[in-house]
A protein has these predicted regions:
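Extracellular carbohydrate-recognition regions
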Residues: 18-42
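Beta-strand-rich interaction surfaces with strong enrichment in secreted/lumenal proteins
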Residues: 63-70, 139-146, 189-190
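Short tryptophan-centered beta-strand motifs in secreted/extracellular beta-sheet-rich domains
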Residues: 79, 150-160, 165-167
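Ligand-recognition surfaces built from glycine- and aromatic
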Residues: 181-211
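Short, solvent-exposed beta-strand-to-loop segments that form ligand-recognition rims
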Residues: 33, 168-188
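Short, aromatic/His-centered strand-loop micro-motif at the edge of beta-sheets
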Residues: 130-153
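Secretory/extracellular carbohydrate-interaction modules
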Residues: 57-128
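Short carbohydrate-recognition loop motifs
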Residues: 39-63
């Protein structure tokens, strides 16, 4: 038992038990632990999503790491993120941040894409999963978020009291990355992608529980 505990403490992003990984001082719940790997990107620890898995029906993201924190009513998630290079699979790539997660059928997420919502209505915006397919809850107006293939500085701020969520990418936000929904309430936050590869580093989650 002591040997197992020591091994778990030493393996930062290797599963210690089913579908759990560790990175950035947190434990994360994932569908398949071997799809993720803690690597070093430019001398900085980075969590890499190595396997793009297609979305199942109903249509919503499943390939994301969910932080094992309390259910936060107010939460801020900050990170540097890097999308899959377009040339790798000739795709229009994206990343996502989950928030107000209650279970696999009830959560919200911010979708950050190389194209705008005006180009593709189910890209680059705020979405809600409520037992079925994801539904857009933000306007479609605004530019693409992932405008280059380097590291992006990303910040999501969610206030469960007012229902407002806003996302900044490289210091900029837009109507498509802002939404208000008072039904969402408290939940957990996570990082990942719909069905693309990606890297995440300098991830920090702070929040406040519901009183």
């Amino acid at each position: 038992m002591r040997t197992l505990v020591a091994l778990c403490l030493g393996l930062a992003a290797t599963a210690c038990g089913a579908d759990m990984i560790e990175a950035f001082g947190l434990k994360w719940r994932v569908p398949i632990a071997s799809d993720w790997k803690l690597e070093t990107a430019e001398g900085i620890p980075a969590l890499s999503l190595l396997v793009p898995r297609p979305s199942t029906e109903p249509r919503r993201p499943t390939q994301f790491a969910l932080a094992e924190t309390p259910d936060f009513l107010n939460v801020t998630l900050e990170a540097e993120m890097k999308q899959e290079p377009a040339a790798l699979r000739n795709r229009h790539n994206s990343l996502m941040i989950a928030y107000a997660w209650k279970d696999a059928n009830h959560f919200n997420y911010a979708h950050l894409s190389v194209d705008s919502a005006e180009e593709q209505k189910v890209h680059n915006g705020i979405f809600q999963v409520n037992g079925g397919d994801r539904v857009r809850i933000s306007p479609e107006k605004g530019p693409a978020s992932l405008t280059h293939e380097g590291w992006h500085t990303v910040k999501l701020v969610y206030d469960g009291v007012t229902g407002k969520v806003e996302v900044w990418v490289d210091g900029k936000t837009s109507p498509s990355l802002t939404a208000v929904d008072k039904r969402s309430g408290a939940g957990k936050a996570g990082i990942g992608s719909f069905f693309d590869l990606g890297q995440f580093r300098k991830v920090k989650i702070t929040g406040q529980r519901a009183r």
